[in-house]
Amino acid sequence: MPIRAYCTICSDFFDNARDVAAITCGHTFHQECLLQWFHSAPHRTCPQCRIQVSSRQIINKLFFDIGGEEETVLDAESLKNEVDRIKASLLVKEKEKRECQGLVDSLREMLDVRNVTIQSQQKELGDMEMLCSTLKKQIKFLDKQQSETKAAKDEARKLRNKLKTMESIEVLLQSQRSEVEEMIRDMGSGQAAVEQLAIYCVSLKKEYENLKEVRKSSAEMTEKLRKELFSSNHKAQKAELELTKVREELSASQKELHSADKEIMSLKKKVEFLQKTLTTPTASNEAISRLIFESPAPIGLERPKLRPPMMGNDINLDVTFDIDTPEHNTQKSVVAPFKKMKFDNKEHPLSSPTKNPLQESKGLMSWAGGRTGADEDDDLTLPSFIKNSLLHKKPVGSLLGLRQNTGAVRTGFDGLGGRTKFIQPSNLTEIRPLHQKMKRKKVSRPTACTSSLANQPRLEDFLK
């Protein structure tokens, strides 16, 4: 059971758990409270009566004898004392908590400041590292440039020495004897001069060998070009001769073609005239018309086929020629003397292809000339069916006078590229005139033909 006295410093009751101290003035306090009071107060005085007290005057511990039966009894004062003590400790703890919380807040603020400082320092560190790497690269680049500059200086020095040597060699090659001797005297007579003279000798020897090679190659090239020039001139002369020959052949071919066209036109006119004369229904040409139109094939007519041209060149069949058509003669034909048929003994043109076809066509279609040979030759030449159809006697009285009007078997151009035999009446005056006179239309070539002919490519253009 606690004592009914309490400490005026802490207001707690005295108990056996804590030591009690006393001062000479008689006042009692807890020992801890008194020591704390003396430690915090400016002067050592009694907390209650305020008298001066020294450390020797303090009784540190008082002993109280308490009965044992009273220990088991809990009274309100002890409980209150315990509650007050707990409240005091709680207040102390809360105060410590507040102090610790303030300390934690200050530490957190300091930590935030330190984090910001660390981030800025890290950023500065990164910048410094980047700057260091850049500076290292720049240092490497400068070292490389320095080495290149050093190498360039060495090369420039070597080239300068080489240039001096080349200038000296050029002086040796191009200068006069006196200048060379003066240069050799300036060099002196030491080991370096001997080495320089040896270099000059070797260079001169190499230059001499190079000049010999260049001269040899130039001579070979000149000879080769001379041969090529000779062959080119020979080829040019040969080509010029061939061109002249081809031009002459072309002009001859054009002339022959022009004459052949004229001959074809004249032959066409003669054929038309003969067809008109054969269309009259007279007794004298009935056998001829029957022989021509009913015969399976004319005498000596071969199967038409394509043959190469005689000159060996291609012929443009689309080319036309401007040839004036003669006017039709409306006058009466003059009575011609009686002419007998005579066969042409010339060879067939197909059997002699080497002859000129223009010359053969001129001799085959001649209308003048009568029968000068014997009748036995004609009988041997004419076939039997022509004799039976042309030379038999007619019992009719109107046909008696036609015995003398015999024709001639001729060989001429058939219009298909070959030759054939045909019957030519000898007396054209006995042919009965037509019932109606056919007016011949004038055929005029358009001017576009000449322009198209002029626009055709010529052989001379290809030979240029």
From Swiss-Prot:
PROSITE patterns cross-referenced by the UniProt entry: ZF_RING_2
GO CC list: cytoplasm; nucleolus; nucleoplasm; nucleus; site of DNA damage
Predominant place of localization: nucleus
Entry-linked SMART domains: RING
Pathway note: Protein modification; protein ubiquitination
Keywords per UniProt: Chromosome, Coiled coil, Cytoplasm, DNA damage, DNA repair, Metal-binding, Nucleus, Repeat, Transferase, Ubl conjugation pathway, Zinc, Zinc-finger
GO biological process, one term: protein ubiquitination
Family membership: Belongs to the TRAIP family.
Name of this protein: E3 ubiquitin-protein ligase TRAIP
